[in-house]
Amino acid sequence: MEGTKKYISVGELEKHNQLGDVWISIQGKVYNVTDWIKKHPGGDVPIMNLAGQDATDAFIAYHPGTAWKNLENLFTGYHLEDYLVSEISKDYRKLASEFSKAGLFEKKGHTVIYCLSFIALLLCGCVYGVLCSNSLWVHMLSGAMLGMCFIQAAYLGHDSGHYTMMSSKGYNKFAQVLNGNCLTGISIAWWKWTHNAHHIACNSLDYDPDLQHLPVFAVPSSFFKSLTSRFYGRELTFDGLSRFLVSYQHFTIYLVMIFGRINLYVQTFLLLFSTRKVPDRALNIIGILVYWTWFPYLVSCLPNWNERVLFVLTCFSVTALQHIQFTLNHFAADVYVGPPTGTNWFEKQAAGTIDISCSSWMDWFFGGLQFQLEHHLFPRMPRCQLRNISPIVQDYCKKHNLPYRSLSFFDANVATIKTLRTAALQARDLTVVPQNLLWEAFNTHG
């Protein structure tokens, strides 16, 4: 009966936001997830970022209907006092329900078999070119094919991390490790750790790891005051070296993207051999060992060191296209400082994303991520459905006066460079005394 319900205020809920005492609210009911957070498949970071808050929209976005039954065991018996739902959230939940009833989350098409076949073809072509030809140009083409193989494998790894794209969870985990660890050398455990945090805290400067690139990049001037990364648990110091590198970031971004893959390799090893709890650590390490067995061996089959270096550079130059795409989706969008909030979750996703407009025949190249807002709103949606729901999302944003940015690949690059240039010029104009001799040498006048 209504009169027997127990209520707590929003202020009381907010007090339960520390490890060892974690409560969240979903559709007005309050749940104690203190112990569950240790078993949460998506890790502890997404829950901690929304601890002590209403997390309804985020829960709907990231969980299938079968997950709701798990909540009852976590129910505290309390309901949220004065629980209100904005019109934006009401419409979002209605959209999610309609898409679910239409079966869009289950209609996965033939993307997996097409992509796996394409990856196999690229890999076979690469190996054949390396082993069966003496031509430098064939070897460079082989490197490009391997780079495209890395891109397509990363897209499949991304898909498998968001939803079960295979016939079972066991096969899905195999696909994750195969495409992530074995084929690209990047741990799926590292990817899920950082990527889930990125989705929840999209474009939060101190909570979203995808924007924390000091000393190399700083998107807004907020980094110039030095921020504390809540994700990494350390200060992002804007020192003399950072000032120098950021001041030229609009010139260096594409070069950095070529070698950015090396950083991902390093991050993978740092996580897998850290003291942090890593799901399936042994399996991830085995997958990485597979990669670091076949990839160096393939490179060693080339006739000399000049060709080996050119092969790797060609390969990494192609994969740089994917790294660039990731920056286009977010760098020129709105940013903010502070934790994500569950009550305006949709608004933050819309403000922090940029779509890339392209013809449907190019969808394979972008892996569905050209529909960045659609993906952020419905991360469990198979990529083959994103183009279908795009007009509906556009109408939704128009109705609620929310931003819906869709730029061509060229225009998105221009917008990103302009954003980086603005921050670079601001970094040069800082009046603080340089602490880096390299900065002083490059900026000495007279």
From Swiss-Prot:
<feature type="transmembrane region" description="Helical">
    <location>
        <begin position="174"/>
        <end position="195"/>
    </location>
</feature>
<dbReference type="Pfam" id="PF00487">
    <property type="entry name" value="FA_desaturase"/>
</dbReference>
<feature type="short sequence motif" description="Histidine box-1">
    <location>
        <begin position="158"/>
        <end position="162"/>
    </location>
</feature>
<feature type="transmembrane region" description="Helical">
    <location>
        <begin position="253"/>
        <end position="273"/>
    </location>
</feature>
<feature type="transmembrane region" description="Helical">
    <location>
        <begin position="112"/>
        <end position="132"/>
    </location>
</feature>
<feature type="binding site" description="axial binding residue">
    <location>
        <position position="40"/>
    </location>
    <ligand>
        <name>heme</name>
    </ligand>
</feature>
<keyword id="KW-0443">Lipid metabolism</keyword>
<dbReference type="InterPro" id="IPR012171">
    <property type="entry name" value="Fatty_acid_desaturase"/>
</dbReference>
<feature type="short sequence motif" description="Histidine box-2">
    <location>
        <begin position="195"/>
        <end position="199"/>
    </location>
</feature>
<keyword id="KW-0812">Transmembrane</keyword>
<feature type="transmembrane region" description="Helical">
    <location>
        <begin position="136"/>
        <end position="156"/>
    </location>
</feature>
<keyword id="KW-0813">Transport</keyword>
<feature type="domain" description="Cytochrome b5 heme-binding">
    <location>
        <begin position="5"/>
        <end position="89"/>
    </location>
</feature>
<feature type="short sequence motif" description="Histidine box-3">
    <location>
        <begin position="372"/>
        <end position="376"/>
    </location>
</feature>
<comment type="similarity">
    <text>Belongs to the fatty acid desaturase type 1 family.</text>
</comment>
<dbReference type="Pfam" id="PF00173">
    <property type="entry name" value="Cyt-b5"/>
</dbReference>
<dbReference type="GO" id="GO:0052631">
    <property type="term" value="F:sphingolipid 8-(E/Z)-desaturase activity"/>
</dbReference>
<keyword id="KW-0746">Sphingolipid metabolism</keyword>
<dbReference type="InterPro" id="IPR001199">
    <property type="entry name" value="Cyt_B5-like_heme/steroid-bd"/>
</dbReference>
<keyword id="KW-0408">Iron</keyword>
<keyword id="KW-0560">Oxidoreductase</keyword>
<comment type="function">
    <text>Plays a major role as delta(8)-fatty-acid desaturase which introduces a double bond at the 8-position in the long-chain base (LCB) of ceramides with or without a hydroxy group at the 4-position. The enzyme produces both the 8E and 8Z isomers (in a 4:1 ratio). This structural modification contributes to the quantitative partitioning of ceramides between the two major sphingolipid classes, glucosylceramides and glycosylinositolphosphoryl ceramides.</text>
</comment>
<dbReference type="InterPro" id="IPR005804">
    <property type="entry name" value="FA_desaturase_dom"/>
</dbReference>
<protein>
    <recommendedName>
        <fullName>Delta(8)-fatty-acid desaturase</fullName>
        <ecNumber>1.14.19.29</ecNumber>
    </recommendedName>
</protein>
<keyword id="KW-1133">Transmembrane helix</keyword>
<keyword id="KW-0479">Metal-binding</keyword>
<feature type="transmembrane region" description="Helical">
    <location>
        <begin position="309"/>
        <end position="329"/>
    </location>
</feature>
<feature type="transmembrane region" description="Helical">
    <location>
        <begin position="282"/>
        <end position="302"/>
    </location>
</feature>
<keyword id="KW-0349">Heme</keyword>
<dbReference type="GO" id="GO:0006665">
    <property type="term" value="P:sphingolipid metabolic process"/>
</dbReference>
<dbReference type="GO" id="GO:0016020">
    <property type="term" value="C:membrane"/>
</dbReference>
<keyword id="KW-0472">Membrane</keyword>
<keyword id="KW-0249">Electron transport</keyword>
<dbReference type="InterPro" id="IPR036400">
    <property type="entry name" value="Cyt_B5-like_heme/steroid_sf"/>
</dbReference>
<feature type="binding site" description="axial binding residue">
    <location>
        <position position="63"/>
    </location>
    <ligand>
        <name>heme</name>
    </ligand>
</feature>
<dbReference type="GO" id="GO:0046872">
    <property type="term" value="F:metal ion binding"/>
</dbReference>
